[in-house]
């Protein structure tokens, strides 16, 4: 029987050659290329809503200046992209019918269609060869900003500033009786795994779309297996791409080891990308408001997924994340105390996540790379204004999980998710030293270490096993002592 394969890119990343991705010179190069990559995505998002309207309309949608001298080249690029999108839509329609509809399909047919869908999705999501010339010539910005003024934000979010649980909490203790119904797609066979998708209406009042996630389980396993819910970082396309590092390093690796992994699409990411914007762009475009809108929605959706895992029989459930995904996990650890018990995770593990988004907006290298600092200043934001929104942007002073249930990995040279913000938070929360690991890496190097190694995976699954064996009452941890590696 046919199965999806482990990506050759991931095999290379796991090899000795992949160690280059943990090094500072390659990180510098990757970060330098990021604005161009985002500009290509911005151009594609603009093309999605301006096909047929001509080059001038496309440039307006892209938030780019007029460029009559490029109209012929843009016209050709749009014609090429129209074919890419038509193919993407045709394959997506067949995939939807096969995995979510009543159409009868065989396992082999679903594997073939999943491969075809990923190729078409990837070609549509990141058409670098089609729009790269616009990014290279700096005509298209990396982000189309629409930053609200501080006064507008204060007026709109006054109630939440006074009571953050309005954003992060649930209405009452009976919420589990009215949670959105979680639907499950048909399965597809992966490399030693069974994989399927979930979807449900987000409980957030501020996002208002369908939450989605991909699930990885051991082939032939029972339902009562420990589960990890793990969020990817900013800009992730999830399974819209042929290669998704977290899929291989977290989803499939844990499933082959006997665990269930749930990899959600964060709001405005992956399959939740809004028309006319690229994956993750809304999070950047309306800072700082968009940051806590995303966090609030993702935190509530995590509660739904934790509850779903328990209804499936999971004896213990952890929540984790990388970078922005780690910020979501930190927020869950700090905000879940008043939730109904089935929605609260047993453990939280973060990788390369900042301890303060408020400080990150002032100190992160990414902010200047993508011109977010200029956009905030142009809208009138000062450090003092941002500090007013810290109750919504940052984790609270004390966690709602026992500190022994919190694990943290971060890079000692991280200038994207500033190192000191993470170190300060874990000290403030009294996270045991044995639960904290500092890697001698930058931001992308820390992510590469997660993808290439197994320390995060071994630590969390060992903790899940202990809790499953003791009925979730064990607060002791034998995680590796804090070191720098």
Which positions does each model-derived feature cover?
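Primarily recognizes the serine-hydrolase "nucleophile elbow" in alpha/beta-hydrolase
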Residues: 305-365
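Alpha/beta-hydrolase active-site loop
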Residues: 277-312
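Short, flexible, mixed-charge acidic loops at enzyme active sites
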Residues: 272-284, 363-367
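The feature captures the conserved acid-bearing segment of alpha/beta-hydrolase catalytic domains
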Residues: 358-421
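N-terminal targeting or regulatory segments adjacent to alpha/beta-hydrolase or S9 domains
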Residues: 1-194, 482-485
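C-terminal catalytic histidine-bearing segment of alpha/beta-hydrolase fold enzymes
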Residues: 423-485
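Short, surface-exposed "cap/lid" segments of acyl-processing enzymes
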Residues: 205-275
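Short beta-strand segments that buttress and anchor functional surface loops
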Residues: 196-205
């Amino acid at each position: 029987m046919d199965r999806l394969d482990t990506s050759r890119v991931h095999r290379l990343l796991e090899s000795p050659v992949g160690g280059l991705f943990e090094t500072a010179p390659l990180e510098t190069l990757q970060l330098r290329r990021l604005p161009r990559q985002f500009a290509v995505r911005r151009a594609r998002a603009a093309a999605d809503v301006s096909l047929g309207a001509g080059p001038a309309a496309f440039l307006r949608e892209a938030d780019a200046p007029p460029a009559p001298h490029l109209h012929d080249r843009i016209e050709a690029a749009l014609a090429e992209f129209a074919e890419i999108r038509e193919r993407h839509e045709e394959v997506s329609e067949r995939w939807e019918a096969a995995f979510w509809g009543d159409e009868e399909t065989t396992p082999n047919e679903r594997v073939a269609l999943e491969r075809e869908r990923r190729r078409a999705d990837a070609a549509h999501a990141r058409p670098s060869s089609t729009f790269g010339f616009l990014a290279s010539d700096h005509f298209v910005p990396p982000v189309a900003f629409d930053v609200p003024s501080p006064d507008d934000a204060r007026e709109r979010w006054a109630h939440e500033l006074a009571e953050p649980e309005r954003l992060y909490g649930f209405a009452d203790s009976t919420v589990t009786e009215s949670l959105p119904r979680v639907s499950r797609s048909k399965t597809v066979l992966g490399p030693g795994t069974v994989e399927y998708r979930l979807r449900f209406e987000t409980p957030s009042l501020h996002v208002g779309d369908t939450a989605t996630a991909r699930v990885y389980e051991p082939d032939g396993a029972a339902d009562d297996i420990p589960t990890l819910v793990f969020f990817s970082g900013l800009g992730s396309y999830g399974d819209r791409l042929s290669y998704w590092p977290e899929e291989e390093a977290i989803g499939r690796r844990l499933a082959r080891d006997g665990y269930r992994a749930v990899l959600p699409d964060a709001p405005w990411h992956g399959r939740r990308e809004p028309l006319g914007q690229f994956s993750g762009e809304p999070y950047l475009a309306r800072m700082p408001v968009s940051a806590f809108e995303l966090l609030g929605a993702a935190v509530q959706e995590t509660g739904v997924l934790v509850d779903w895992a328990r209804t499936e029989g999971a004896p213990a459930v952890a929540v984790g994340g990388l970078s922005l995904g780690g910020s979501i996990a930190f927020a869950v650890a700090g905000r879940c105390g008043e939730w109904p018990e089935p929605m609260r995770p047993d453990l939280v593990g973060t990788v390369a996540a900042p301890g303060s988004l408020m400080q990150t907006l002032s100190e992160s290298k990414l902010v200047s790379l993508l011109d977010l600092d200029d956009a905030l200043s142009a809208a009138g934001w000062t450090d003092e204004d941002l500090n007013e929104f810290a109750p919504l942007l940052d984790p609270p002073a004390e966690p709602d999980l026992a500190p022994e249930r919190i694990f943290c990995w971060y890079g000692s040279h991280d200038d994207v998710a500033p190192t000191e913000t993470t170190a300060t938070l874990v000290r403030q929360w009294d996270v045991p030293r044995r639960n904290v690991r500092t890697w001698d890496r930058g931001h992308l190097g820390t992510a590469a270490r997660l993808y290439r190694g197994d320390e995060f995976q071994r630590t969390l699954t060992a903790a899940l096993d202990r809790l499953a064996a003791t009925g979730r009452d064990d607060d002791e941890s034998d995680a590796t002592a804090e070191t720098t590696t």
